Amino acid sequence: MNRNKLLNGNGGHIWVDGELLGNVKSVDFKLTGNFADIACCGDPATYAAYEGYAGEGTLETYKVNSELVTKIVEGFSTCVIPDTKIITKVENPVSGRAERWALTGVVFTEAAVAKFEAQKTIEESLPIKFTHAENLEKIKG
């Protein structure tokens, strides 16, 4: 194994609606397939019938401003949920190769309006749901 090909989070970047976030701690975005169990008489096997997918995840940040949380709360308060797009990029600084994804139909499902603790850096956990994930750039072997 060539350790210079390994990726790590230090090469990760997130853009929300075109704005690069410099305060990201971690991201975990995934698609989950929805499958129905199908059992047929005379066949002991259970089959999985694909019925669609759901996109969800969490953006973890260090709190440096109130802009994103305010946008989420305003959407909840006015019933006008913003149309949000997220771009992710993780790159290997040695090889210069990168993987990028675009998430569309993004909605933030939760926002903590106040959360802090003495002698602790404030972190925000922002759960999302999304409708589409498109690979913009992939790393080949």
Regions found by a protein language model. Give the residues of each.
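Short acidic DE-rich linear segments
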Residues: 137-141
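Short, acidic/charged, Gly/Pro-enriched secondary-structure junctions
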Residues: 71-102
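Solvent-exposed edge beta-strands and adjacent loop segments
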Residues: 1-71, 100, 104-125, 135
